[in-house]
Design a protein with these regions (language model features):
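Conserved NTP-donor binding/palm subdomain of two-metal-ion nucleotidyltransferases/polymerases, i.e.
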Residues: 1-70, 75-307
């Protein structure tokens, strides 16, 4: 793709961009290698991990290797989770487990959607049971990923979790916008799922942001009365300011990342959170508080200690 005449970038900038692209592609290749190795390891021990985000989200892009790599997130059924946890794993406030595998952080989850409200969690379990896992484009057939329906719900709920707390990054918003545009799913079912999970207002704000600022087709945003549309515009503008101030744009790296700092971040954002998803905001803070007080141990359970 060529820039318009007069807008060409200086050679020094082009050289830096070329170096960054090369580094990004190398990180992606390493992430792919480690992810496949880890999935094969678990599979050889009779476990059935499902890939969340990461390479699954990268498959949505025209050039997957140009999506910046992050952590490796895997879902295990409740019956398999403790068998998958290595002895060095740390329990997190959100009830996931994390450890480092060859320099890359791995997170293990016993639920797919980042939902805390009890009645909504039951709905999340129902939706997950109706949406079997599938393959991931560009990866071996034995790699299990999410169905289009679950992928979009995961990305939207995960974005909400970050928005309620430390802030969201542009990469995650782009993942969501691409999933909305590219995945084959029934939009009426998606809207019903959002109502059942208490995500309708949040998804409306997120869609508004993606349509107005990221080029998502306006057809993906429902029609609203003028007063409600202005309210959504205002909330998405506020969300955009947070997007530019936090996440990939620098401020997050300066914060403490312990459980107490995470808890305080959620409390400090409560005013905005209550306008987006009040029930989820309340139960997320409650869950984090409980998670700090009680940290379950996998001792006594069958563990995988060979990683």
């Amino acid at each position: 793709m060529a820039m318009d005449e007069g807008l060409e970038l200086p050679e020094t900038v082009l050289a830096r961009l070329a170096a960054e692209v090369d580094a990004c592609e190398r990180r992606y290749a390493r992430m792919q290698k480690l992810t496949l190795e880890l999935l094969a390891f678990y599979g050889s021990r009779g476990l059935h991990p499902v890939l969340l985000k990461g390479l699954d989200s990268a498959s949505l892009y025209e050039i997957p290797s140009l999506r910046e790599s992050g952590d490796i997130d895997l879902y295990f059924s409740e019956n398999e989770l403790f068998a998958a946890i290595p002895k060095e794993a740390v329990h997190n406030a959100d009830n996931s487990w994390s450890y480092v595998f060859r320099g890359v952080e791995v997170e293990l989850h016993d639920h797919i959607l980042d939902i805390e409200r009890p009645s909504a969690r039951r709905e999340a379990q129902r939706i997950a049971s109706e949406s079997p896992s599938g393959s991931v484009e560009g990866l071996p057939a034995e790699v299990r990923g999410l169905s289009p329906r679950m992928r979009i719900l995961l990305l939207s709920s995960h974005l909400l979790k970050h928005c309620l707390g430390r802030g969201i990054g542009l990469r995650q918003v782009c993942d969501y916008a691409l999933a909305r545009a590219a995945c084959d799913y029934d939009r009426r079912i998606f809207e019903a799922d959002c109502r059942a999970l208490g995500l309708s207002r949040w998804v409306a704000v997120l869609d508004n942001l993606c349509v107005r600022h990221l080029g998502l087709d306006g057809n993906f945003s429902a029609s609203y009365a003028e007063r409600e549309r202005r309210r959504l515009d205002s909330l998405s503008d506020r969300l955009l300011r947070r997007l530019l101030d936090e996440g990939n744009f620098g401020r997050e790296s300066g914060r403490g990342k312990g459980a107490l700092n995470t808890f305080m971040a959620f409390l400090s954002n409560m005013g905005f959170s209550l306008k987006l998803a009040p029930g989820e905001a309340f139960y997320t803070v409650l869950s984090l508080a409980k998670g700090r007080l009680k940290k379950p141990s996998p001792s006594g359970k069958t563990q995988n200690r060979s990683l």
